[in-house]
Amino acid sequence: MFRLAVIVLASGALLAGAAQAQDAAGYPSRPVRIIVDVAPGGGVDTATRLVAAKLEQSLGQPFVVENRPGAAGSIGAEVVYTAEPDGYTLLASSPSPLAINQWLYKKLSYDPAGFQPIAMMSRIPNVLVVRSDFPAKTVQEAIAWLKVNPGKASFASQGVGTASHLTGVMLMKLTGTSMVHVPYKGTAPILTDIIAGHVDMTFIQVSNASVMHDAGKARILALATDKRLDFLPDIPTLAEVGLPISTDTWNAISAPPKMPAAIVAKLNAAVNAALRQPDVRKRLHDLKTIIGGDNGPAEAAKFVETERRQWGELVRAAGLEPQ
């Protein structure tokens, strides 16, 4: 009886594996949605659209990018989390829904640890940007100005609980300053208001900030990185002025819980192949983006878990309590 049970179980496992392989062989057979958790125009959105175009070519079906910003990425994350795990609804996310929100909100409509990471696409360093006529030329001068003008400056973020918001909170905590927080739903509207002078400063991706900096429409004062960047050699890091702040805005492709491993593997291979394409690499390099290709699902999952732990430490260090 025991031997018969083992045979039955083994046969079931083999049949399930064969079915998964067959499903992956015919995948995709219809259009695939990629839900982006931020508004159009930012680094996460741009990288996703570049990869989606290559996936269409390699897998033979449309990969439709759909922006669902709001609630620090939770709106888009919920759409994917509750979707069928069949490979036709994917999430391209910033750190917020997968690594940050659980530390800021007592109740979420999804389990951040329940997603199935497929691949890391990109990492974009964050930088401190001020409007072009802000009364400070260096980060030291900016901090000195903030200290004698408490509550008079405004800082924009991509929403409550996003990397840009938490980085700004850490800056205030470490310097003993205060600013008015102005949350947005994405990077593009922040850029518009920084250029127009409606907000004073922000932490955003260097890919967006460098364009404004080079055009004289805004100024990068410091890098939220561990070391200086080759393409901005004259811009200091916050660590150089005694502020140990280092944050990236990364972009991961994930699937709903329990998606078949064979489909995960097929998508992982296709995403990595897309990131190896010379035109994609050049475009991402021009956008000052660190390419995250040639990583497997297990590596992506490990990266997200490490980020989740580190962001939890940052939230606690910032003195923020779950709401």
Where are these regions (language model features)?
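An extracytoplasmic/periplasmic, membrane-proximal ligand-sensing/linker region
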Residues: 29-31, 173, 261-323
